[in-house]
C-alpha cells in the first residue's frame, strides 16, 4: 500500500471523531506520481476539515484534500463509491452503513442528475452560456 496512505491510516488510528475515512483518486487506483495529492473522503461530524487536511498534509509531506462524505455531489459520490478504499473506521459497520446509504442515494439521484444535465446542455445549445 502507498506509504502516504499508511501514514494517514496511522494518524487516524484511535480517532473516534472521524467515523470513516476512504482514500480515492490516483492513490487508491495506484496511478499516483510521487508528488500527487492524496484524496480522502471522511464522515466526521463536527471536525474542522481544513485543520484535518492540514494535519494530514503535515504528516505525509503531501497535499491532502479532504472532502466531507455528507456534502459530496452525485459525480463525486459515485467516484468515491467506485474507487474508495477504507483507511479508517471508528466502529464495526460504519463503512457498510455508509455504502448502503450512498448506493441508495445514487440509485435515485443519478437518473435525476442525468436528466438535469441533458436539460442544461440543451438550454446552453439553444441560448448560449
Model-based region annotation:
Residues 39-41:
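Short, well-ordered beta-strand segments
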Residues 1-20, 28-34, 43-129:
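Catalytic core of pol beta-like nucleotidyltransferases
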Amino acid at each position: 500500500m502507498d506509504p502516504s496512505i499508511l501514514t494517514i491510516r496511522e494518524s487516524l488510528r484511535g480517532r473516534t471523531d472521524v467515523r470513516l475515512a476512504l482514500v480515492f483518486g490516483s492513490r487508491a487506483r495506484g496511478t499516483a506520481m510521487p508528488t500527487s495529492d492524496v484524496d480522502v473522503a471522511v464522515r466526521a461530524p463536527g471536525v474542522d476539515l481544513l485543520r484535518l487536511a492540514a494535519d494530514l498534509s503535515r504528516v505525509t509531506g503531501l497535499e491532502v484534500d479532504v472532502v466531507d462524505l455528507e456534502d459530496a455531489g452525485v459525480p463525486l459520490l459515485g467516484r468515491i463509491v467506485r474507487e474508495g478504499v477504507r483507511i479508517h473506521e471508528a466502529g464495526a459497520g460504519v463503512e457498510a452503513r455508509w455504502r448502503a446509504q450512498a448506493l441508495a442515494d445514487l440509485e435515485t439521484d443519478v437518473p435525476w442528475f442525468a436528466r438535469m444535465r441533458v436539460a442544461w446542455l440543451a438550454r446552453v445549445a439553444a441560448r448560449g452560456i
